[in-house]
Amino acid sequence: MPTLAVHGGAGRLDRRARRAEIDAALERALGAGFDAAGGGALDAAVAAVQVLEDDPLFNAGTGAVLTATGGVELDAGVMVAAGLRTGAVAGVTDFANPVELARAVMEDGRHVL
């Protein structure tokens, strides 16, 4: 049986008041992952992370914590066990879904980061 887990983050913010909203967003991420799972585990993981990156409730993408200068710097990474393939990006400032860039780095194969 396929299994997919998403992690909505950790931190000091009191999320109890928004629990239903957060749970619904996590369900959307899981749904997107399972919808994309026909393409494989990587497709499922990337689709799920994109939902989290697009939701301001999470410290990723749209909801990322701002830097000291008020900007956004995003990091992302992907890994595929078969072939020990990996790709990552760091400090991305002008791209909505850095997980897509991390995947592109991995698929290009010339670099890891």
Tell me what each language-model feature is.
Residues M1-L113:
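Alpha/propeptide regions of enzymes that mature by internal proteolysis
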